[in-house]
């Protein structure tokens, strides 16, 4: 999966999906508008997430946990046990702890990017969207939205978005790619508008690490 795809909006819910009538029946247009409006209210965020990857051809499964920090516009930092990915909107640093290697590249986005910014700005222009149902949880209903890229050349086949109805925040996102690899991000904790410092989005290269500059 590409560096850009790892920015997800990122973002352990196992409930039966219900398609019966709910207290409020939402349309796709209403849900996407509410998501966009909620995103406009966020200047920065710190998200603790769990990531589950199921590789399509081998059925091997992996679990990770990490922290996503984001700040508008186009500033992201994703940290996990395996790697750190940082961008200031101009440059991307991808550091592998196991290899002690830093790959540096120019930050690029396209219409099918899964970065939070592009994802929200391009709804619904670049995706076919459908409502798949609801999940009942103690904290309230979760709305399940399925998105399919309109571009047949997209690396992503589909995205399932789990939205908390009473806050309009993303609680889980499931990405299926053309290799049938399914990547799930589940939000464990989220803090909004904490005034994250700009220096958070510049990577300090560890001494002695190998540098691969692709710019």
Predicted segments, located by residue:
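N-terminal leader/targeting segments and the immediate start of mature chains
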Residues: 2, 17-61, 71, 75, ...
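Flexible, surface-exposed loop/linker segments and immediately adjacent secondary-structure boundaries
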Residues: 107-141
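Bacterial N-terminal signal peptides that target proteins for export
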Residues: 1-7
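An acidic-aromatic
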Residues: 65-114, 183
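Bacterial N-terminal signal peptides
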Residues: 8-16
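Gly/Pro-enriched, hydrophobic low-complexity segments
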Residues: 129-208, 212-215
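Beta-turn initiation residues at beta-strand->coil junctions
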Residues: 51, 80, 174-177
